[in-house]
Regions:
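Catalytic-domain carbohydrate-binding cleft regions of carbohydrate-active enzymes
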Residues: 1-107, 116, 148-152, 179
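Short, solvent-exposed loop/turn segments enriched in Ser/Thr/Gly
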Residues: 111-116, 127
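Beta-strand-rich interaction surfaces with strong enrichment in secreted/lumenal proteins
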Residues: 120, 168-172
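Surface-exposed beta-strand/loop patches in extracellular or lumenal glycoproteins
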Residues: 120-141
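Beta-strand-rich N-terminal accessory domains
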Residues: 122-126, 182-187
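Solvent-exposed beta-strand/loop surfaces of large extracellular or lumenal domains
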Residues: 141-167
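Short Pro-Gly-centered flexible turn/kink motifs
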Residues: 173-184
Length: 187
């Protein structure tokens, strides 16, 4: 089939790039809240995110040549450049989030079948949130997760993850609360 008319269809014609961009926006908002806890403010990454997210959101979708000549090099270059703005915004936001999480004690990689994980609420309201992390392993058939403070055993769900096993559960958090959970492989 023919290529989409990016000019005419706009945001709906590029769902993957838009999803990537919206994830960058979400990560940036999380980082704004995490900064309240860490006091760390990386102006360079904030500026990189801001510049690129603005360029992505403002830049038009395509060129009038997409209607008559969609395979033209200029059309392809404009499309690639526009998508790169979303990607660079996402990269800056992800780097900023990794920096914030590291300051809060996260190791960012989990290879052990038993250990501890910290979850941080970025909400100013008491709420129940999903907590998810993955363990890089070939198999993990069962796991026990316990809230270190209350000793409550959490109801967990295990699912496949591209790099191992994803562990998911729900936990109630006070505003901006940090919680530590212990996870242990079960036979």
């Amino acid at each position: 089939g023919a290529l989409n008319d990016w000019w005419g269809n706009g945001v709906g014609s590029t769902p993957y790039a838009v999803k990537h961009y919206k994830e960058a926006v979400r990560l940036n908002r999380i980082c704004d809240r995490l900064e309240e806890k860490t006091g760390v403010h990386n102006e360079e990454l904030i500026q990189a995110y801001g510049d690129n997210s603005l360029l992505y959101a403002e830049h038009t979708w395509g060129h009038s040549a997409t209607v008559t000549n969609p395979y033209d090099t200029m059309v392809t270059n404009l499309d690639m450049r526009k998508n790169s703005y979303a990607s660079k915004a996402h990269e800056a936001a992800a780097m900023r989030k990794n920096e914030q999480c590291h300051k809060l004690g996260d190791i960012l990689r989990y290879y052990n079948l038993s250990g501890k994980v910290k979850a941080v609420s970025t909400s100013h309201q008491k709420r129940v949130f999903p907590v998810e992390f993955y363990v890089e392993t070939l198999s993990l058939s069962a796991v026990k997760v316990t809230d270190d403070k209350t000793k409550q055993e959490m109801e967990v769900q295990l699912s496949a993850h591209p790099r191992g096993v994803l562990i998911s559960f729900l936990a109630e958090f006070e505003p901006m609360e940090e919680k530590t959970f212990t996870y242990e492989e079960q036979p």
